[in-house]
Every structure is written in C-alpha cells, then in structure tokens.
Amino acid sequence: QFSDCSKDEYQRYLT
C-alpha cells in the first residue's frame, strides 16, 4: 500500500 507521499505522486501520474 502506498504511503501518503507516494500516493500523492501516484495521483499526479493518473492525471
């Protein structure tokens, strides 16, 4: 599971 920091970058990746 992604941590908050990694999750935020993952959201940018989806954008």
UniProtKB/Swiss-Prot annotation:
<dbReference type="GO" id="GO:0004222">
    <property type="term" value="F:metalloendopeptidase activity"/>
</dbReference>
<keyword id="KW-0106">Calcium</keyword>
<dbReference type="GO" id="GO:0005576">
    <property type="term" value="C:extracellular region"/>
</dbReference>
<dbReference type="GO" id="GO:0046872">
    <property type="term" value="F:metal ion binding"/>
</dbReference>
<keyword id="KW-0378">Hydrolase</keyword>
<dbReference type="GO" id="GO:0044523">
    <property type="term" value="P:venom-mediated disruption of extracellular matrix in another organism"/>
</dbReference>
<comment type="function">
    <text>Snake venom metalloproteinase that disrupts the muscle fibers interaction with extracellular matrix proteins. In vitro, is able to proteolyse extracellular matrix proteins surrounding muscle fibers such as laminin and fibronectin, but does not show any direct cytolytic activity towards the myogenic cell line C2C12 in culture. In vivo, induces a massive degeneration of myofibers, but has no hemorrhagic activity.</text>
</comment>
<dbReference type="GO" id="GO:0006508">
    <property type="term" value="P:proteolysis"/>
</dbReference>
<keyword id="KW-0460">Magnesium</keyword>
<keyword id="KW-0964">Secreted</keyword>
<protein>
    <recommendedName>
        <fullName>Snake venom metalloproteinase Mlp4.2</fullName>
        <ecNumber>3.4.24.-</ecNumber>
    </recommendedName>
</protein>
<keyword id="KW-0645">Protease</keyword>
<dbReference type="GO" id="GO:0090729">
    <property type="term" value="F:toxin activity"/>
</dbReference>
<comment type="similarity">
    <text>Belongs to the venom metalloproteinase (M12B) family. P-I subfamily.</text>
</comment>
<keyword id="KW-0482">Metalloprotease</keyword>
<keyword id="KW-0479">Metal-binding</keyword>
<keyword id="KW-1015">Disulfide bond</keyword>
<keyword id="KW-0862">Zinc</keyword>
<keyword id="KW-0800">Toxin</keyword>
<keyword id="KW-0959">Myotoxin</keyword>
<comment type="subunit">
    <text>Monomer.</text>
</comment>
<keyword id="KW-0325">Glycoprotein</keyword>
